[in-house]
A protein has these predicted regions:
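N-terminally biased helix-coil "hinge/interface" segments that flank
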Residues: 1-660
């Protein structure tokens, strides 16, 4: 019998399942993700399930948190953003200027008006000069034109020129969204461009391992809304896989538990992702996914992502105290397991009469990408790590190397190692398999650190480990409170969730106050998934006064979700009225003007229907069915007259994934 193969590649683990809709999970395996060569971890997971149950594979589904993690951690390849006709003030909206960071941004004349008419001629000479200037230092380009969703001509012209001059990937804003919000559209295009090399590396790794095993089945990737797209589609639009892993986890959790209404909280190595199921369906955010503080324009399952996981960096927040995340760190227990010589380095640090701030911290290469563009200080650090991990005190022989190291980390070339909640679980015997000795040494080094404002050193290593897990548990509970408040429409849910009363309600020490002991209660059960869900979520649910559900196969829920979904694509066409008696249709193919609304609507419906069906088939769907809706915006005027403002025609195409 043919089975489906589900794969989930996360920041720490790569999971694989063999799945049959009638029987459920036939075989499952979990292996470490190998960032330096993704194919190794993927191949190991695939081999493990096929050894358990050799089978013919008809379909392969892939979910991944790599894109999500890259956005949360501020990583990604350098990309050049070309803004066409944008006002200078647009850079200060939607966090666009902050998101650009050190990447080149070019503003050129051009763009359109809301009517779709040109506001200024496109300055292709300026584009040509900028592209030739910046191409050697970037891996991709992003193009965003003012009101390009009403007329994409300028974006298309720049895209074609960049392709002719460089051959490098180009992302256009109008290809990703039809929504009106120029800064957020530019932000989404930029994130997409940065993620293209990472996604290409992942898909090549999966396809290579499938080919090596003679598996010729179609490969599809989970989108952020939980639906599936063909691998070639994901290569061009990787930003749509932001929240791929979390979306797959929601689909998988629904399948595993049968729960219709619940919170779904997925704890991974890097992030905790929280979603809500209502009436058996995940809530979808039509306004766009929010990841790592950025509000994109990618339609996705309504998920709140927090930099909080088993491998989150443990640190001191000045004036506040012990903090966990948002950056991922390689657990010391894993580092010493993979590099036993690091255990000796930890012992040397512990044997010193006095500790230093860099004790228990290491750096190692993560992956080799575009290293030809490294600055001399960055190259010095990169070369120092050629033979394996090194203590930070060795790597940072000069304070002048602090910023170059941070840049290498931000680009995803280098990763730091230090104490994490996973290490704390090793110390306390809640987790095993890696080096407990390294975890104990790391905790002991932390326990002897001098006091800082907001933090008093614990009495010993075990006390420190308990404080780390308490911080993770309390922060996870507050993250769920924030998700609930956000869904209830609270204006600033992050601030409200971390007020005095919520913090005291989820605290592990009930004796914090003898006079006031507030309690909180979630209105839905809590489904906890992820490799460490059983360790944390029963206690988190208890503190939040709700039922805890940790299903069988909770550790491979994402891989299950990768093969339990379908194909879904939408196309939106807008109709405006630039003047009385004229109705303009704004479609991806261009604009057309009609003399009546019904003529315009008929054309818009045909455009939307054809576009949605084509996208669904391109995304790998079969047996595609299309539904079309139309929403008119009409304003009532004095005297009983109605004024047409605009109309939105939405076509939704749904189908089953194509089987091999």
């Amino acid at each position: 019998m043919s089975l489906s193969l589900g794969i989930d590649t996360g920041g720490t683990f790569t999971d694989a399942v063999l799945f049959d809709p009638g029987r459920g999970v036939v075989a499952a395996a979990k292996r470490l993700t190998t960032k330096h060569d993704l194919a190794l971890g993927i191949g190991a997971a695939i081999d493990a399930v096929l050894e358990q149950h050799p089978a013919e594979i008809a379909f392969v589904g892939l979910s991944t948190t790599l894109a999500t993690n890259a956005v949360v951690e501020g990583q990604g390849n350098p990309a050049c953003l070309i803004l066409i006709g944008y006002p200078e003030a647009a850079l200060d909206r939607a966090g666009l200027r902050e998101a650009i960071g050190g990447d080149p941004v070019v503003a050129v004349a051009g763009g359109h008006r809301p009517s779709g008419e040109e506001q200024a001629p496109l300055d292709l000479d300026a584009v040509r000069a900028a592209v030739l200037r910046h191409a050697p230092a970037v891996t991709a380009f992003a193009v965003a034109g003012y009101f390009a969703v009403r007329n994409p001509a300028h974006e298309q012209a720049v895209r074609d020129l960049v392709d002719d001059l460089t051959g490098k990937p180009v992302t256009c804003g109008h290809e990703l969204t039809s929504g009106l919000d120029a800064p957020r559209r530019a932000l989404t295009a930029l994130l997409n461009a940065r993620l293209i090399p990472l996604t290409a590396s992942l898909i090549r790794a999966v396809r290579g391992r499938l080919d090596a095993r003679g598996i010729k089945a179609p490969l599809m990737v989970v989108k952020g809304d939980g639906s599936l797209i063909a691998d070639r589609f994901a290569l061009a639009r990787p930003v749509e896989t932001v929240l791929s892993g979390p979306a797959a986890s929601v689909v998988g959790a629904r399948w595993l538990t049968g729960r219709e209404d619940c919170f779904v909280s997925d704890i991974g190595g890097t992030t905790t992702d929280i979603a809500i199921l209502k009436d058996g369906r995940p809530l979808v955010n039509r306004e766009g996914a929010q990841v790592g503080g950025w509000r994109t324009m990618v339609e996705a399952v309504e998920i709140r992502t927090f930099g909080l996981g088993g491998d989150s960096e443990v640190r001191i927040e000045p004036g506040i105290g012990l903090a966990v995340g948002p950056r991922r760190s390689v657990p010391l227990s894993l580092l010493a397991h993979q590099h036993p010589e690091m255990l000796a380095a930890l012992r040397r640090q512990a044997d010193r009469a006095e500790g230093i701030s860099l004790d228990g911290r290491f750096a190692l290469r993560l992956r080799a990408l575009d290293t030809d563009t490294l600055s001399p200080p960055e190259r010095r650090i990169w070369d120092a790590l050629a033979d394996g991990p090194q203590p930070l005190e060795t790597v940072l022989s000069s304070h002048l190397l602090d910023r170059p190291l941070e840049r290498l980390v931000a680009r995803g070339l280098v990763i730091l190692s230090g104490f994490t909640p996973t290490d704390a679980a090793h110390v306390l015997g809640l987790h095993g398999g890696w080096s407990r000795d390294a975890a104990l040494l790391g905790a002991a080094l932390w326990a002897r650190r001098p006091a800082e404002p907001g933090w008093t050193p614990p009495v010993d290593a075990e006390a420190f480990a308990r404080s780390v897990l308490e911080r993770l548990t309390a922060d996870s509970a507050l993250a769920l409170v924030e998700a609930a408040l956000a869904r209830d429409g609270v204006a600033d849910p992050a601030r409200e969730a971390r007020g005095l009363l919520p913090r005291r309600a989820v605290a592990g020490d009930p004796a914090a106050s003898d006079l006031l002991r507030p309690t909180l209660a979630l209105g839905l059960p809590l489904v906890g998934i992820g490799a460490s869900a059983a360790t944390y979520y029963p206690e988190i649910a208890r503190r939040l006064g709700t039922e805890s559900v940790v299903p069988e196969h909770a550790g491979v829920t994402n891989a299950i979700g990768a093969v339990a979904s379908g194909v879904l694509q939408r196309a939106i066409v807008t109709i405006t009225a630039p003047e009385e008696g004229r109705f303009r249709v704004h479609a991806p193919a261009g604009i057309r003007t009609f003399g009546s609304l019904e003529e315009a609507a008929a054309h818009a419906e045909a455009e939307a229907r054809g576009r949605a069906e084509a996208l669904a088939r391109e995304a790998g769907g079969q047996e595609v069915a299309v539904t079309v809706t139309r929403a008119d915006r009409v304003v009532s005027m004095a005297g009983g007259l109605d004024l047409f403002v605009e109309s939105t025609v939405t076509a939704t195409a749904a189908g089953r994934p194509r089987m091999g």
